[in-house]
């Protein structure tokens, strides 16, 4: 098994560990040995315990002490996730995929992705670096998600949609097919996007 530490001792971090543990349990050859959390929040001290796993210290401390470990960044805010990825660029960032996600074998996805339980990623879809696809979200066929995109639970990105980098979809939002969502845009809970929108648009 390969050592893995989680950045972010919080709800998303707990979900990541739960997903890894379930994946390990279902595998004949478990892949990951979870060694703990790294977190810069000063409320955490090195050696603390968070729900059964040790705090390894700050990001820099964990990176120094475990230089060969893989890292999963369990941070929902896109800009913060991007910053952490730069800071820890010497590590590898595996994708974590829930056993109950449905992913087409023709799907391309890159490092650091998280695909939650019940998510569906259809044929021909492309997922960029450090993408989050939340529980029961759907990426329809031939859609493209850029880097550091976060799809909240129940979100639907329709067929052929191009989602540029750093876009946030909150729960149960959706798009029409074959449109473009500009870089840095925010789609709020339950909102639908009917036509292409430019960068940094809030819907």
Segments (PLM) and residue ranges:
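Short, solvent-exposed amphipathic alpha-helical segments in soluble enzyme
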Residues: 20-24, 88-90
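NAD(P)-binding Rossmann-fold cofactor-contacting core
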Residues: 25-46
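Alpha-helical elements of the RecA-like P-loop NTPase motor core of helicases
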Residues: 14, 18, 82, 195
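Phosphate-bearing ligand-interacting subdomains
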Residues: 42-102
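Glycine-rich adenosine-cofactor-binding loop
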Residues: 2-21
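Structural signal for interior beta-strand "rungs" in well-ordered beta-sheet cores
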Residues: 96-203
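Short hydrophobic segments within beta-strands
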Residues: 6-7, 38, 74, 188
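Short active-site oxyanion
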Residues: 2-4, 33-35, 68-72
């Amino acid at each position: 098994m390969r050592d893995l530490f989680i950045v972010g001792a919080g709800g998303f971090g707990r979900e990541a560990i739960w997903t890894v543990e379930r994946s390990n349990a279902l595998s004949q050859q478990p892949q990951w040995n979870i060694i703990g959390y790294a977190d810069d929040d000063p409320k955490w001290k090195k050696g603390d315990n968070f729900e059964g796993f040790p705090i390894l210290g700050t990001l820099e401390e964990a990176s120094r002490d475990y230089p060969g470990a893989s890292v999963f960044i369990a941070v929902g805010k896109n800009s913060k996730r991007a910053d952490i990825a730069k800071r820890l660029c010497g590590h590898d960032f595996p994708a974590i995929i829930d056993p109950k996600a449905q992913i087409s074998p023709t799907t391309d996805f890159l490092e650091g992705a998280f695909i939650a339980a019940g998510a569906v990623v259809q044929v021909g879809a492309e997922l960029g670096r450090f993408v989050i696809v939340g529980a029961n979200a759907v990426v329809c066929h031939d859609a493209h998600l850029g880097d550091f995109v976060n799809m909240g639970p129940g979100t639907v990105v329709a067929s052929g949609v191009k989602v540029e980098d750093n876009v946030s979809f909150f729960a149960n939002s959706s798009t029409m097919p074959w449109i473009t969502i500009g870089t840095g845009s925010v789609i709020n809970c339950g909102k639908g996007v009917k036509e292409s929108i430019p960068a940094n648009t809030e819907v």
